[in-house]
């Protein structure tokens, strides 16, 4: 997949497509000296990173106004969501969280370059305050589901939902997580890989 194919398949505006290209160029430039993503995956930016992340947008409700992306890394899916939300004229703020300072520096540079409604925080995810009232929690390649729910459960209150990317072994992760947690889960097949997206809510510690 290339830029033009991505543009056709998503239907985003030319301005938004330019934003994705700027993000890609910043990623290539920064990744030359700072390990943000595997270098071998940069040639697959449009399919493996951009489209994979962008597919999440169709599962983001129109009432969502505050999103937290845990373990944000190079911005997948947080930056893609911020670009997509602006493209569909939805006023929503994305908070990208990562404990690695160099990654957060890249995220802040990207947010500024694209003038996104977003912020990046160099903190551990467990320090996020549930009182901030996030509507949606996202994570991609961050932690096994059992551990991820430990981080996210305080934030998944008051009808908040999680959208978590998982690989082919997601059933094993669900089985392990259900030993420790009760939750509602919808399994959504990924459009770009053999993995899935898990929509999770109503999370509580198992008795």
UniProtKB/Swiss-Prot annotation:
Top-level taxon of the source organism: Bacteria
EC number: 2.1.1.170
Pfam families: GidB
SUPFAM superfamilies listed in its UniProt record: S-adenosyl-L-methionine-dependent methyltransferases
Subcellular location: Cytoplasm
Family label: Belongs to the methyltransferase superfamily. RNA methyltransferase RsmG family.
One Gene Ontology term of the molecular function aspect: rRNA (guanine-N7-)-methyltransferase activity
Reactions it catalyzes: guanosine(527) in 16S rRNA + S-adenosyl-L-methionine = N(7)-methylguanosine(527) in 16S rRNA + S-adenosyl-L-homocysteine
Binding site for S-adenosyl-L-methionine: 71, 76, 125-126, 140
Top-level taxonomy: Bacteria, Pseudomonadati, Pseudomonadota, Alphaproteobacteria, Maricaulales
Name the UniProt record assigns to this protein: Ribosomal RNA small subunit methyltransferase G
Keyword Cell division attached: no
GO CC terms in record: cytosol
Top-tier EC class: transferase
Keywords for the protein's UniProt record, in alphabetical order: Cytoplasm, Methyltransferase, rRNA processing, S-adenosyl-L-methionine, Transferase
Function: Specifically methylates the N7 position of guanine in position 527 of 16S rRNA.
Transmembrane segments: none
């Amino acid at each position: 997949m290339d830029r033009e194919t991505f543009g056709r398949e998503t239907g985003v505006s030319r301005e938004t497509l330019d934003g994705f290209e700027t993000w890609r160029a910043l990623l290539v430039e920064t990744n030359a000296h700072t390990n943000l993503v595997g270098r071998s995956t940069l040639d697959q930016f449009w399919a493996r990173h951009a489209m994979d992340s962008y597919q999440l947008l169709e599962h983001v409700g129109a009432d969502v106004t505050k999103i937290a992306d845990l373990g944000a890394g190079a911005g997948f899916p947080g930056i893609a969501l911020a670009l997509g939300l602006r493209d569909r004229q939805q006023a929503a703020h994305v908070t990208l969280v990562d404990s690695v300072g160099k990654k957060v520096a890249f995220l802040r540079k990207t947010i500024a370059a694209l003038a996104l409604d977003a912020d990046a925080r160099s903190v551990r995810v467990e320090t996020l305050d549930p009182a901030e009232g996030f509507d949606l929690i996202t994570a991609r390649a961050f932690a096994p589901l059992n551990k991820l729910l430990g981080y996210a459960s305080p934030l998944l209150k008051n009808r908040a939902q999680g959208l978590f990317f998982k690989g082919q072994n997601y059933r094993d992760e669900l089985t392990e997580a259900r030993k420790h947690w009760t939750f509602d889960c919808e399994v959504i097949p990924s459009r770009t890989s053999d993995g899935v997206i898990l929509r999770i809510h109503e999370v509580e510690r198992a008795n």
